[in-house]
Amino acid sequence: MGMSFSHLLIVLLIIFVLFGAGKLPQVMSDLAKGLKAFKNGMQDDGSDNDKNK
């Protein structure tokens, strides 16, 4: 019950319409930075637990 290619295209089209061509690169950049910070935070949290053992 995953997303098919047509569903993915529809979602991308909606995002493009909502944010427009001008803002889309900035939105994607901010999203990537947020995901990277989240991933780093999860790794830091895991290493803190290892130190406490």
From Swiss-Prot:
Localization in the cell: Cell inner membrane
Pfam families from the UniProt entry: TatA_B_E
Membrane topology: Single-pass membrane protein
Single GO cellular component term: TAT protein transport complex
UniProt keyword terms in alphabetical order: Cell inner membrane, Cell membrane, Membrane, Protein transport, Translocation, Transmembrane, Transmembrane helix, Transport
GO molecular function, one term: protein transmembrane transporter activity
Major subcellular location class: membrane
Alphabetized InterPro entries for the sequence: TatA/B/E (IPR003369), TatA/E (IPR006312)
Signal sequence segment: none
Transmembrane parts of this sequence: 1-21
Gene Ontology terms: biological process: protein transport by the Tat complex
Keyword Membrane: yes
Subunit structure, as described in the record: The Tat system comprises two distinct complexes: a TatABC complex, containing multiple copies of TatA, TatB and TatC subunits, and a separate TatA complex, containing only TatA subunits. Substrates initially bind to the TatABC complex, which probably triggers association of the separate TatA complex to form the active translocon.
Entry similarity comment: Belongs to the TatA/E family.
Function: Part of the twin-arginine translocation (Tat) system that transports large folded proteins containing a characteristic twin-arginine motif in their signal peptide across membranes. TatA could form the protein-conducting channel of the Tat system.
PANTHER family on file: SEC-INDEPENDENT PROTEIN TRANSLOCASE PROTEIN TATA (PTHR42982:SF1)
Protein name, as recorded: Sec-independent protein translocase protein TatA
Originating species: Rickettsia akari (strain Hartford)
Lineage: Bacteria, Pseudomonadati, Pseudomonadota, Alphaproteobacteria, Rickettsiales
